[in-house]
């Protein structure tokens, strides 16, 4: 995932097969963590109790502190998560599996 250009894509064996797609990442002070991470949890109908029960459909978590890909406006900065359009969030949710690598730069 390219935070500078706010783009993400899915790869298999080093080949891009979906994307790049528009994303929004964490706002200043709530930055999306860079580095190599791994998918550790998926929740289709997630709700954020930390942020006033905000809906987080198609959440794919890749850190141990609540950072995930999920559906939301990909032009509005987040509290650290990666916002995707609905169709992209659905695709990420369906394609990414527990243990898959997520590289953020």
Task: List where the protein language model places each region.
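Cell wall/extracellular polymer interaction/catalysis modules
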Residues: 1-27
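Exported/periplasmic cell-wall-interacting domains
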Residues: 27-36, 40-105
């Amino acid at each position: 995932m390219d935070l500078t250009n706010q783009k993400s894509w899915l790869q298999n064996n080093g080949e891009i097969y979906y994307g790049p797609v528009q994303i929004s990442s964490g706002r200043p002070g709530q930055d999306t963590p860079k580095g190599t991470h791994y998918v550790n949890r998926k929740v289709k109908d997630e709700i954020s109790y930390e942020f006033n029960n905000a809906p987080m459909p198609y959440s794919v978590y890749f850190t141990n502190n609540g950072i995930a890909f999920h559906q939301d406006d990909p032009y509005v900065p987040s509290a650290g998560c990666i916002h995707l359009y609905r169709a992209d969030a659905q695709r990420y949710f369906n394609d990414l599996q527990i243990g898959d690598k997520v590289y953020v730069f």
